[in-house]
Amino acid sequence: MNSIEFPLLDRTTPISVISTTSNDLSNWSRLSSLWPLLYGTSCCFIEFASLIGSRFDFDRYGLVPRSSPRQADLILTAGTVTMKMAPSLVRLYEQMPEQKYVIAMGACTITGGMFSTDSYSTVRGVDKLIPVDVYLPGCPPKPEAIIDAITKLRKKISREIYEDRIRSQQGNRCFTTNHKFHIGRTTNTGNYDQGLLYQPPSTSKIAPEAFFKYKKSVSSPELVN
């Protein structure tokens, strides 16, 4: 495991008094006691079972899983995020106290994964909803990769300046947006439907009921204009 940068010592005295800055001391205390909120929706989340065991034992890094976002300062998102779950994820993030961090784990969380090509309900990347500090690719990532991602996050925290992070968060607010269609193949014919174009949220006029239209001659729903 990579070494972590601890607070820089300004000076020491013969009576064992250490002098440092409040910012460095705060960073060191936070990186040594990260309390994660585990947000798992599919198979990537199963890898956390290996971390809990004695072989990896992520408790030794000061990680204490919490069930409440108000007690957590790190949220680990693993698995596919759907449009129905997006408001709940944003609400959990907003309920976390400052300073708070996000690790996006797995291809489905980062880009939508294999569901991003023809699924109307999949969010193409969790960073469209909340700011992400560390991206962890893989399908699924190994437990060693998860530990490495946590190590990189701890290094990032050790070099952090509190005022800069607050200023960045004030200028980049997160919010939910409706996800729109790309041009895709219909369910039955395999032909491209030119009516379902990808448009910005402000200009899209496609009504939700127009996405699926049932016909008596079709056994399954078909995308129509």
From Swiss-Prot:
Provide the reaction this enzyme catalyses. Answer: a plastoquinone + NADH + (n+1) H(+)(in) = a plastoquinol + NAD(+) + n H(+)(out); a plastoquinone + NADPH + (n+1) H(+)(in) = a plastoquinol + NADP(+) + n H(+)(out)
The UniProt note on the cofactor reads as follows: Binds 1 [4Fe-4S] cluster.
Give the UniProt subcellular location, in the record's own words. Answer: Plastid, Chloroplast thylakoid membrane
Task: Summarize where [4Fe-4S] cluster binds, as residue positions.
Answer: C43, C44, C108, C139
Cited SUPFAM superfamilies: HydA/Nqo6-like
Q: Name one GO biological process term.
A: photosynthesis, light reaction
Listed A to Z, the keywords are: 4Fe-4S, Chloroplast, Iron, Iron-sulfur, Membrane, Metal-binding, NAD, NADP, Plastid, Plastoquinone, Quinone, Thylakoid, Translocase, Transport
One GO CC term on file: chloroplast thylakoid membrane
Cofactor section: [4Fe-4S] cluster
InterPro entries xref list: NADH_UbQ_OxRdtase-like_20kDa, NADH_UQ_OxRdtase_20Kd_su
Q: What EC number is given for this enzyme?
A: 7.1.1.-
According to the record's subunit comment, the protein's assembly and interactions are: NDH is composed of at least 16 different subunits, 5 of which are encoded in the nucleus.
What is the protein named?
NAD(P)H-quinone oxidoreductase subunit K, chloroplastic
Species: Populus trichocarpa
Q: What is the lineage of its organism?
A: Eukaryota, Viridiplantae, Streptophyta, Embryophyta, Tracheophyta
Q: By which gene is this protein encoded?
A: ndhK
